């Protein structure tokens, strides 16, 4: 087969697919252009999840006719003149790829007008080709309307998600800009319904609008400077850690994914974090553009620092200093005793699980509880072996088995007074799209920005409903990757861990005997997360070690 040179139009569409991967990336690129244009009001409109139409309107400086007629062409930009400029700019877009890429794979209409012009101008570009240009009477600023995304790349359009999923990802991108630019009036509508209308305000007020479940009095402002670096943002106090992850990192106003920054944040809270607990942190790191490489990823969401160690120490120490974190090692688990007691009393579940050793199936009465050591381990003696049982892991697996076997039985508890939970638009859309909570035993309805919970599973205490729902959202986001069944198991595993007896909880010998009997009867060897439940020592091995045989 002979090697051929690809047609220019094919090359353009392939390249565009690297920059634009879905509705969310169009929204991201167009909002960035609006911010670069100095806009203090940006309106985003989505129709059918953005697959039919995406509209971004701003009141920025606008473009003259000559600029408008070249803005959709390859590598056209007003921000750099030489290659070295890409390492010294603070603007978001700069490579001249975004608008060009969008126009290559859609039907795009652009309106723009500067303050000094009497008239604005309108152009339409279809698959990268200019269809028309004409003068129009409009206000200062730019409006970009993107229709039929990937209409000319059917293979890529086929892989767009459902309307709900595409919209949810776009809303998440929009929310990041709301956090990084609270001084801008940002408005979002979906199918002509207003989702957000956020006036220019402070970061704390933005957080309040986007995260109604976070206690405002737990947020501490962060403002720190060292050498040529600055850190601004908010972080939650160590007493208000939660199971749902909410960490947003920005560099020079740009949302980024960077393991170094994540590690620095978690390091600041290291003395307080228990398993599956996270801080709420929104930080914006400012440093000279020459010390950052944003060209690691086509969408510029990954960055590299030339001063890794300095950045890590600065971010970590700034958070610790501003929060005035004391050196203590205790934080409330918030696990209701009522839930723990109820879970101890249930009968043996039907579900069976394999184990690493078939010999663990021991007659229920053929063991003896020697005692409980370090408020953590049950010591069990049988005729041939000594077992050390982690009672938290064992109890966790028993709860998991029961909950798994009760799925789809619709035996929940109706609430006399429904629980109202305020959630973000993207979170409500996620819950509405998926059926996980209803399969677990919930019944609810969505009214405006609230989830109204009317029925809960029998194993959940009403005081824990809000916490459970919020904790489950991050797992539900993974359905498209892992599938409904796996995500349901993950949620149930997390509930089991939370509800199970913990180290240092009081456990009498009768409860210990019950747990051990259930472990042997159900051939349990690991907790739902894969940790071992018990460790065994053969008496012959002990005798050999002590040279008694």
UniProtKB/Swiss-Prot annotation:
SUPFAM superfamilies: ATPase domain of HSP90 chaperone/DNA topoisomerase II/histidine kinase, DNA mismatch repair protein MutL, Ribosomal protein S5 domain 2-like. PROSITE patterns: DNA_MISMATCH_REPAIR_1 (PS00058). The keyword Transferase does not apply. Keywords: DNA damage, DNA repair. Pfam families: DNA_mis_repair (PF01119), HATPase_c_3 (PF13589), MutL_C (PF08676). One of its GO terms (cellular component) is mismatch repair complex. GO terms for molecular function: ATP binding; ATP hydrolysis activity; ATP-dependent DNA damage sensor activity; mismatched DNA binding. The keyword DNA damage applies. InterPro entries: DNA_mismatch_repair_CS, DNA_mismatch_repair_MutL, DNA_mismatch_S5_2-like, HATPase_C_sf, MutL/Mlh/PMS, MutL/Mlh/Pms-like, MutL_C, MutL_C_dimsub. Disulfide bonds: none annotated. It comes from the Bacteria. Coiled coil: none annotated. GO terms for biological process: mismatch repair. PANTHER family: DNA MISMATCH REPAIR PROTEIN MLH, PMS, MUTL, DNA MISMATCH REPAIR PROTEIN MLH1. Belongs to the DNA mismatch repair MutL/HexB family. HAMAP family: DNA_mis_repair. This protein is involved in the repair of mismatches in DNA. It is required for dam-dependent methyl-directed DNA mismatch repair. May act as a 'molecular matchmaker', a protein that promotes the formation of a stable complex between two or more DNA-binding proteins in an ATP-dependent manner without itself being part of a final effector complex. This is DNA mismatch repair protein MutL. It comes from Pseudothermotoga lettingae (strain ATCC BAA-301 / DSM 14385 / NBRC 107922 / TMO) (Thermotoga lettingae). The gene is mutL.
